Amino acid sequence: MGFCIPLRSKMLKRGSRKSSSILARRPTPKKMNIVTDLENRLKKNSYIENTNQGNILMDSIFVSTMPVETLFGSYITDDSDDYELKDLLNVTYNIKPVIVPDIKLDAVLDRDGNFRPADCFLVKLKHRDGFTKGALYLGHSAGFTATICLKNEGVSGLYIPGTSVIRSNICQGDTIVSRSSRGVQFLPQIGGEAIFLIVSLCPTKKLVETGFVIPEISSNDNAKIAARILSEKRKDTIAHIDTLIQHRQQLELAYYNSCMLTEFLHYCNSYADTIKESLLKETIQKDINITHTNITTLLNETAKVIKLVKSLVDKEDTDIVNNFITKEIKNCGGVKNRDKIVNSLSLSNLDFRL
């Protein structure tokens, strides 16, 4: 099913990873063997700890992967615009409620039958969306929240407040189950679109009748600081990427103007006997010189921004960022006769990749 990350300091030191509490990308899934129903049941999570003092709500983080394309394919390809935009101070995201059959959520249910799926939501993040402060709180305060990545065309980051779980890039299928009272903080989204399925797991009638203790949740101050730093870093990266796209659009326009002015000056020189206005030619040449200066300035500024983005983006994420920039440039419309200008001036040979 997955693995559990207890939030006790002694337990956090265990495992094959470095002592750092920040989780890296998930490893490549291993080939699964066929297991019996009993074995499969034993692999499932347990959200209640049975002690001499009674049932205690666990304060652990459960991390696993799910075959989301098989289970939730219709939600991944859904391009409807019925999401509700939440655009507040330090928070921007799109959300809508959805109905998901319980059978598709079996992987996040506990083996003891103490919790059931209640409400489900789709959260969509676009470039620049996310949380710089605060978190998303959904579901029962005495329950758990399952966060499942259905789609990620960009660089998505996630932090479970008060814990050591910080993910710099969530992959499709990644699943994290945590206490609902902690919330989920989606770090600023870089590049393409991401969609998450949020499942609220509430106590069942059986558990409520049995009774259980809700302990105070622990807190990791160092992780809070790390998450804040990572959030600010991602904001800077987004700003530099936006500047890079803007420079690229301005550069295209400058090349276009340069080409048109040069063609006009050539026309004037070709018909020198007819066009005798030397002042006109001087004005055109002056405009050409100004345009060339702008091009040089833009190229220099672009090189600086590329260097900055390279220093901020993880090496394995550069292709994602490059593809996003290329897509944004193509979608911006640009000037007319773009292909002709680009080809004639070899603009496509300029190095805009990170």
UniProtKB/Swiss-Prot annotation:
Keyword Ribonucleoprotein part of the UniProt annotation: no
Induction of expression? Expressed in the late phase of the viral replicative cycle.
- Classification via Pfam families: Pox_F11
Q: Which UniProt keywords apply?
A: Late protein
Tell me if Amino-acid biosynthesis is a UniProt keyword of this record. no
- Disulfide-bonded cysteines: none
What family does this chain come from, according to its entry? Belongs to the orthopoxvirus OPG055 family.
Q: What does this protein do?
A: Stimulates increases in peripheral microtubule dynamics and may increase the motility of the infected cells, contributing to cell-to-cell spread of the virus. Seems to inhibit the signaling via the GTPase RHOA and DIAPH1/mDia.
What is this protein identified as?
A: Protein OPG055
Q: What are the leading ranks of the lineage? A: Viruses, Varidnaviria, Bamfordvirae, Nucleocytoviricota, Pokkesviricetes
- Which gene specifies this protein's sequence? OPG055
